[in-house]
Amino acid sequence: MDKQDIIDFFDRLAPDWDNNLIHDDVKIGAILNFAGITKGVSVLDVACGTGVLIPDYLAREVKNVVAVDISPKMIDIARIKFSGRRVKFVNADIETADIPGIFDRCVVYNAFPHFPNPQGLVHSLAGKLISGGRLTVAHGMSRKKINEHHSVSASKVSIGLMSESDLSVLFGTYFDVDIALSNKEMYVVSGIKR
């Protein structure tokens, strides 16, 4: 999977992304609870797209959010939608970008299969978190539905969503996994950095 293909794919989808989005407040609330998104924490939002989770972070009174996406058009839309000193948008490849700062929480929401090197991504994100910080990979639908959807519409830019047990093993080098959940409603793997 080529990163330029990923950029092109999401740039094409960006203009209609929000129109096609289903924002389930109950699921997102549960995911953000698992992710430890609470008042005063700093958040690194990886593959933020058009800023889908920004209102939820701000409603929880986080200290600040750095939202990163590889797609320039996704970031452009996010910047138009949200401004303020608590949110900074960065158009970059999170695996190679020099993102200033270190964070309390890192969330990868509805995006993990689009990273061609999951082990490299986990390594990179571990380096962006404080000791005791939390990394959460989550999807607002089941693993089966994600993989079915990607096999039809995004096969060129998705490696598929691995099982929660396999992702927990990848996390294990840096994180103590305390949440590994995959059901008909959502997929969440989350752990605390040692």
Regions flagged by a language model, labelled:
Residues D176, L181-R194:
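Core SAM-dependent methyltransferase catalytic element
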Residues G120-S131:
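A short glycine-rich, Lys/Arg-flanked "PGG" loop and its adjoining helix->strand segment in the class I
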Residues S158-Y174:
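Short alpha-helix
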Residues T50-T96:
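Class I SAM-dependent methyltransferase SAM/SAH-binding core
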Residues M1-G36, G40-G49, T136-M162:
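Conserved class I S-adenosyl-L-methionine
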